[in-house]
C-alpha cells in the first residue's frame, strides 16, 4: 500500500511539518494577465527577501459562487497561458483548483499542484484523476468533515499511486454563515502522514454571509495564522489582493498585499520558535 510522503517537494519548495514554513499565496481568482503578474512579482520579491518558499496560487474558474451573477475568472485556456508565463518569469511553482476529472489532464502539464476544493474532497473520481496525473495534490478538508476522516480522502490519492499529497485545514461549519478553526485538527491531520497546510483566509469566511456573496473577517487572519504556526504546520495558504474590498471574489477575507511582508515576518518568527522546541 502506498502511503503519503511526509515531505513533499514542489519545484524548489519543500512542504514538511518539521521543515521551515512554506507559503501558498496569490489572489482568489485570476482576473487579468497584468494583474497576475503584478501580484506574482510582489509576492516573489517579499518571499525572496524573507527566505520563504512560495507556491503561487490563483483560480481560473470560481465554480462555487454564492450567486449566479458572480464573477468566476478568466477561464482555463487563458489561465494556463498565464501560469506558464509566470513560471518562466519568476521560477516558482503554481497551484490552481480543479473541479472535474477532465480538467486534471488539461491542467497537469502546466500546473505543479492540483487543488481539490473543500466541497469536492470526497469526490472519488476527481481525486483519482488528480492523483493519476502524477502532480502534487492539495486537498482542502471539507467544512463538514472531521479531521480524522481525512484518512480516507488521502487514501484515495495514495492508493491511486501518488504519495505526494498535502492536506489543508480551512475551518469547519459552525451554525449558519460561520466557520471556526479547531486547532486540534492540525496535529490530528499531521498524524495521517501528509504535510499539513493551514488556510488562514478561507478560515475567516462567512459563507453566504452577505446574502448574494460570501462575507469574511480578515481582521482575524493573523490571529488564526499565528495560532496554527505555533501548533506547527508545513505551510500557510493566504489569499491576497492589492484592493480586497473591490476584488471580484473573497474580498472580505483576503489580506491587502501591502500588509503581507509584516505579517509573514511575524509568522516566520513564530515558526522558528515552534520548530525549535
UniProtKB/Swiss-Prot annotation:
GO cellular component: cytoplasm
Gene Ontology MF terms: 3-deoxy-8-phosphooctulonate synthase activity
Keyword terms: Cytoplasm, Lipopolysaccharide biosynthesis, Transferase
Catalytic reaction annotation: D-arabinose 5-phosphate + phosphoenolpyruvate + H2O = 3-deoxy-alpha-D-manno-2-octulosonate-8-phosphate + phosphate
Domain of life: Bacteria
EC number(s) recorded for this UniProt protein: 2.5.1.55
Biological process terms in GO annotation: keto-3-deoxy-D-manno-octulosonic acid biosynthetic process
Associated pathway: Carbohydrate biosynthesis; 3-deoxy-D-manno-octulosonate biosynthesis; 3-deoxy-D-manno-octulosonate from D-ribulose 5-phosphate: step 2/3; Bacterial outer membrane biogenesis; lipopolysaccharide biosynthesis
Protein location: Cytoplasm
Similarity comment text for this entry: Belongs to the KdsA family.
Name assigned to this protein: 2-dehydro-3-deoxyphosphooctonate aldolase
